[in-house]
């Protein structure tokens, strides 16, 4: 798996990373796993399933909520992470080191808009920035997530 710096992020909090063999590894962002809380169940897509970009293809559940996972690209599901199936809580321990499934797609074309890691961090801070701006009238503050907005 490549470095998190090469990951592409969807605004729906999936990350995707294309490996040298052309397969696209998919997981969820750290922000998503923190918002979910303790992950207890992962309903994976079906192996060999054809998926369309943006389609809800899997579900991840915690004690607090359930969330759809969307396909960042169109293609075929060619691998499922059996470790996550057996121990879904692994997603909480290492969200950028644990992939959920792999999609076979030779060219990585993402659902608009996708962002690099830095741009994604800015999106995460956006709601806090608006709340803080209204309350204190200042544009540059650190959000509760600890990122400079």
Swiss-Prot record:
Keyword terms: Lipoyl
Keyword Oxidoreductase: no
Domain Lipoyl-binding, chain residue ranges per copy: 23-104
Any one GO cellular component localisation term in the record: glycine cleavage complex
One of the protein's GO biological processes: glycine decarboxylation via glycine cleavage system
Cofactor(s) recorded in Swiss-Prot or TrEMBL: (R)-lipoate
SUPFAM superfamilies membership: Single hybrid motif
A Pfam family that the UniProt record links to this protein: GCV_H
N6-lipoyllysine modified-residue sites: 64
Matching CDD domains: GCS_H
Co-factor: note: Binds 1 lipoyl cofactor covalently.
Similarity remark: Belongs to the GcvH family.
Entry function: The glycine cleavage system catalyzes the degradation of glycine. The H protein shuttles the methylamine group of glycine from the P protein to the T protein.
Subunit structure: The glycine cleavage system is composed of four proteins: P, T, L and H.
Record-given protein name: Glycine cleavage system H protein
Organism lineage string: Bacteria, Pseudomonadati, Pseudomonadota, Betaproteobacteria, Burkholderiales
């Amino acid at each position: 798996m490549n470095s998190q710096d090469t990951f592409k992020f969807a605004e729906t909090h999936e990350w995707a990373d294309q490996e040298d063999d052309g397969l696209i590894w998919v997981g969820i962002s750290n922000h998503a796993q923190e918002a979910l809380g303790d992950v207890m169940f992962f309903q994976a897509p079906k192996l060999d399933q054809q998926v369309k970009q943006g389609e809800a293809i899997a579900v991840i559940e915690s004690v607090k909520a359930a969330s759809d996972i969307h396909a960042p690209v169109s293609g075929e599901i060619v691998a499922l992470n059996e470790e996550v199936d057996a121990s879904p809580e692994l997603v909480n321990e290492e969200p950028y080191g644990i992939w959920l499934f792999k999609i076979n797609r030779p060219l990585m074309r993402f659902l608009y808009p996708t962002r690099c890691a830095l741009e994604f961090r800015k999106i995460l801070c956006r709601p806090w920035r608006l709340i803080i701006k209204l309350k204190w009238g200042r544009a540059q503050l650190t959000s509760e997530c600890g990122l400079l907005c």
